[in-house]
Amino acid sequence: MSATAATVPPAAPAGEGGPPAPPPNLTSNRRLQQTQAQVDEVVDIMRVNVDKVLERDQKLSELDDRADALQAGASQFETSAAKLKRKYWWKNLKMMIILGVICAIILIIIIVYFST
């Protein structure tokens, strides 16, 4: 190697013809701020999501309570409908028996009247 080659400053990397690059400390601070901003944004989104989940849980709980009340009402309705059906079945049976007895009495009267 020659002595002149040692005194020549090294060539600048390709594409660096513009202003000097900022110190690495400023670049890392900027990256840190960007990362912190992204973290803050994610934290805000997660808070909103947690609030939505809590609201959804509350609505589901209310819906479950309403479903339980509806189920209880349906059971009560089914019981009272069965009692009412039984009541009218007996009432209908009594009317049929009474009608049968009346027809039998009329038939007996007709038979006795025409047989003499």
From Swiss-Prot:
GO terms for biological process: calcium-ion regulated exocytosis; cellular response to insulin stimulus; eosinophil degranulation; establishment of localization in cell; exocytic insertion of neurotransmitter receptor to postsynaptic membrane; Golgi to plasma membrane protein transport; hormone secretion; long-term synaptic potentiation. Pfam families: Synaptobrevin (PF00957). Nervous system specific. A higher level expression is seen in the brain as compared to the spinal cord. Expressed in hippocampal neurons. InterPro entries: Synaptobrevin-like (IPR001388), Synaptobrevin/VAMP (IPR016444), V_SNARE_CC (IPR042855). It comes from Rattus norvegicus. Residues 2-94 are cytoplasmic. Its main location: membrane. GO terms for cellular component: clathrin-coated vesicle; cytoplasm; cytoplasmic vesicle; cytoplasmic vesicle membrane; glutamatergic synapse; membrane; neuron projection terminus; perinuclear region of cytoplasm. Involved in the targeting and/or fusion of transport vesicles to their target membrane. Major SNARE protein of synaptic vesicles which mediates fusion of synaptic vesicles to release neurotransmitters. Essential for fast vesicular exocytosis and activity-dependent neurotransmitter release as well as fast endocytosis that mediates rapid reuse of synaptic vesicles. Modulates the gating characteristics of the delayed rectifier voltage-dependent potassium channel KCNB1. Residues 92-116 are annotated as: Required for interaction with SEPT8. Residues 1-28 are annotated as: Disordered. GO terms for molecular function: calcium-dependent protein binding; calmodulin binding; identical protein binding; lipid binding; molecular adaptor activity; myosin binding; phospholipid binding; protein-containing complex binding. This is Vesicle-associated membrane protein 2. The modification N-acetylserine is found at S2. It is found in: Cytoplasmic vesicle, Secretory vesicle, Synaptic vesicle membrane; Cell membrane. Phosphorylated by PRKCZ in vitro and this phosphorylation is increased in the presence of WDFY2. Residues 31-91 form the v-SNARE coiled-coil homology domain. The record marks Q58, K59, L60, R66, A67, Q76, F77, A81, A82 as: (Microbial infection) Cleavage. Gene3D superfamilies: 1.20.5.110. Part of the SNARE core complex containing SNAP25, VAMP2 and STX1A; this complex constitutes the basic catalytic machinery of the complex neurotransmitter release apparatus. Recruited to the SNARE complex following binding of the SNARE complex component STX1A to STXBP1. This complex binds to CPLX1. Interacts with POPDC1 and STX4. Interacts with VAPA and VAPB. Interacts with WDFY2, PRKCZ and PRKCI. Interacts (via N-terminus) with KCNB1 (via N-terminus and C-terminus); stimulates the channel inactivation rate of KCNB1. Forms a complex with WDFY2 and PRKCZ. Residues 115-116 are vesicular. Belongs to the synaptobrevin family. The chain crosses the membrane at residues 95-114.
